[in-house]
């Protein structure tokens, strides 16, 4: 919902330059994910994953409400949208690894494949339903409602995370963060299956 409303907002603000700014907006939103997700994985190993994910949700909720407020008070500018896209991308870069690594702590190992499948289903279902809801909300209530509803949706996730009681057990390494990053990349490089999956994932993400 957020992305579709944001694209419409960029079209409205940029006018004849909308193609460039649409591309720039997507680039700035995805660049932090490309650059910082590896670091986010190391941070998720070292720190409380639930708190890290909570922080990510708070930031994304704030950017949604921020856009709603800027549009409502008619002070929105294209640079606001670009900046908030980058901030959202940064939050996702650290929240994504925390989310993925939190899941095995919540369920039995035998149920993990089903949990991963269910997580994938809900993610893709949201990608299908989100644009439909965004279009309906835009037509009926306008952009403020789209951003506001998206911001409110984070409250449910935050409430669920606050209700979780997961004991944080740091991964003992004694290594510097840079060394852990190198170790992770070295492991992936020597696992052919992981290399293939990484290339496929990068290509599909990059090409849309």
Regions found by a protein language model. Give the residues of each.
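Alpha-helical transmembrane-bundle signature of multi-pass membrane transport and export proteins
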Residues: 1-208
């Amino acid at each position: 919902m957020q992305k579709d409303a944001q694209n419409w907002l960029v079209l409205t603000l940029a006018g004849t330059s909308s193609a460039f700014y649409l591309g720039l907006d997507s680039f700035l939103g995805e660049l932090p994910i490309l650059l910082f997700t590896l670091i986010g994985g190391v941070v998720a190993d070292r720190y409380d994953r639930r708190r890290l994910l909570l922080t990510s949700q708070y930031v994304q909720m704030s950017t949604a409400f921020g856009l709603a407020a800027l549009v409502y008070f008619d002070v929105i500018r294209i640079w606001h949208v670009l900046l908030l896209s980058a901030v959202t991308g940064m939050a996702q870069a650290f929240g994504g690894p925390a989310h993925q690594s939190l899941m095995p702590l919540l369920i039995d190992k035998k149920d993990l494949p089903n949990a991963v499948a269910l997580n994938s289903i809900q993610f893709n279902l949201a990608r299908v339903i989100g644009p439909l809801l965004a279009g309906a909300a835009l037509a009926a209530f306008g952009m403020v409602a789209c951003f506001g509803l998206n911001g409110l949706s984070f409250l449910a996730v935050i409430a669920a995370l606050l209700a979780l009681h997961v004991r944080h057990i740091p991964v003992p390494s004694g290594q510097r963060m840079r060394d852990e990053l190198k170790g992770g990349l070295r492991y992936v490089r020597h696992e052919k299956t992981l290399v293939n999956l990484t290339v496929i994932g990068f290509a599909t993400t990059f090409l849309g």
